[in-house]
Amino acid sequence: MITVDDCNGCNIFIGPTKGSVFLRDCAECRFLIVCQQFRARDCKVVDIFLCCATQPIIESCNDIRFGCFCYNYGALEDQFKNACLSIFNNNWSNIHDFTPAEGERNWSLLPKDARIEDFFPLPSPEKLGDLQIMTDPQSSLVSQTHGCLQRLSMQYCLVVFFADGHAQNRALSLIKELEQTDNILLRTKEILLEEEASERIFGTNAYNKVVKRGPVIGLEYNGKDCISMCLETAKNIATSTGCTGLVYVSTCPKTARKQIENFFSHADVHKIETKS
């Protein structure tokens, strides 16, 4: 566990951590954090750009703002792997408040256009050395998700990539292509699925064999015509890679919401499995 106590007016970066990060009695601070578990207690006026594999928890906190960890540098990918963390398992916006105040909210999400460099000014080139730091969302190792509170329309789409040794690259390719559209990526998750869960999510046993190959990567999209856009993009990627049977895309708006609920509910109640 990494514990940060009694900090005031600090900027703190905590790189990929296999265990938990615990903030206590911090005020007017800004954090960049990647961890398995996150908790804050007795903190106030704190901004946190977070990548957390499990649900973040706050207790007796006030005016805490959360944003998606959108950052990159040369060694970050290896650090994720060494910490056994998946770049697709980020619950940054799904906050549990142990001590909610009636009529008030102790936490909020940072504005969608919040830029990390405005909170964490980059050091001088002399101090940076060859770190190759990038702070724009398009260059981030962790994809920018908009969180469970953001919505553009009533249409949703679930995209699931099955393990074949290239699932991560194909998922990132789809995310990159859809960044050029008006659709938004709400959530991502990398988990193992059993046959029973697979049938409940997809409504068929047709995927029972492929889910046994390893973790699947699920993406939740929202936006007008997001289903048709996801289908077209996934088809183009499948055609170019020759892996036409290793991706699932919702085809019906009426069933997509239920599929998304089943997929992410299953992920929330089961232990996250990551590749070491």
Question: Which functions belong to the PLM regions below?
Answer:
Residues 49-276:
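Intrinsically disordered, low-complexity terminal regions
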Residues 1-81:
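Extended, compositionally simple hydrophobic/Ser/Thr-rich segments
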